[in-house]
């Protein structure tokens, strides 16, 4: 291309002559003036900005996320707040990176560690958040993972689950959330948690480190072990949010020991927790390291949130209040057969007590109700005369049968 001085030449786009513009660029039988070039550049820049803006994720505020969690999750206020802020900052970071506002600033990922007893709602919290954000979500069990050379799953199979959840849309998967449960089980095998650490467990932690901190991983599309000549899917994990959780049974003793030593060494100015207080809320990185997680792994999980053990009152609320409350679900199932279902207060309390006795927390509630409801749901559809079923405390304890009210009984 070149500039030309022929006054008879006109711009092929706007029609202006050589004399009306500063520059005229010649191509193969076409000409374009400097004004059209400037206009085209502005149009391209605007279109690129629109594309960039469309790539930015719509992020709910921490308050909006917290309110959404409150609709489904009872209690755990501190954990819900910590999660909402961490998730908000994570997706704000992705948008910040996409906007290229400040290329000289690098924001680190806010991966999260949830510590709490079985059935306290760790998995459900992560699942509910992902659903509210409309991002792909996958759950993995750390106990099924092994390092290279051992029988078991490669850590890359976690990413395969996320790809499957996103219908193999790699771009969506790269903005998803992965929850890894039972992370405490790869920390140790010995009961003496402060001295011995399981070697293969440490190997799994090392393998997880790479994908958690951000890397381009090769994922076998069919799962299983990787082998030569197998086609791989490349997925960048730098924008995937990892939430890991575990019960960390016994970590309270490590916290007690640390706090006790401080009191002996520095006098009464240090805080001493009473038996009623939750030591879980006092956990720091040092305690988690003593439990058996390696420092590098802990360093990739900057947000630590402790969940409290659920009380009877919490479990009763879980049964009755959330949008997806189990009692509401069972009532609706029977309502499809025009039958009213009533759980007496004593029955709800008995269900909660059983869950606490079994140490299953909220996740054990459904199985307790199923034990009672199975026969009812089997019989009711065959008896059109039944209009109401009443469940009492004695029914839950196996000492009585459910009360069935029939149409004839009302007359």
UniProtKB/Swiss-Prot annotation:
State where Zn(2+) binds. Answer: 11, 14, 33, 36
Please provide the record's keywords in A-Z order: ATP-binding, Chaperone, Metal-binding, Nucleotide-binding, Zinc
Q: Which GO terms describe its cellular component?
A: HslUV protease complex
Binding locations of ATP: 117-124
Tell me the ranges covered by the ClpX-type ZB domain, including all copies: 1-52
Recorded hits in Pfam families, A to Z, give: AAA_2, ClpB_D2-small, zf-C4_ClpX
Name the CDD domains on file.
RecA-like_ClpX (cd19497)
GO molecular function (one): ATP hydrolysis activity
The protein's matches in InterPro entries, at most eight in alphabetical order, are given as: AAA+_ATPase, ATP-dep_Clp_protease_ClpX, ATPase_AAA_core, Clp_ATPase_C, Clp_protease_ATP-bd_su_ClpX, ClpX_bact, P-loop_NTPase, Znf_CppX_C4
Can you supply a Gene Ontology BP term from the record? Answer: cell division
Superkingdom: Bacteria
Function description: ATP-dependent specificity component of the Clp protease. It directs the protease to specific substrates. Can perform chaperone functions in the absence of ClpP.
Q: Which HAMAP family match?
A: ClpX (MF_00175)
Tell me the protein family, please: Belongs to the ClpX chaperone family.
Q: How does it assemble?
A: Component of the ClpX-ClpP complex. Forms a hexameric ring that, in the presence of ATP, binds to fourteen ClpP subunits assembled into a disk-like structure with a central cavity, resembling the structure of eukaryotic proteasomes.
Record protein name field: ATP-dependent Clp protease ATP-binding subunit ClpX
Instruction: Say which species the protein is native to.
Output: Lactococcus lactis subsp. cremoris (strain SK11)
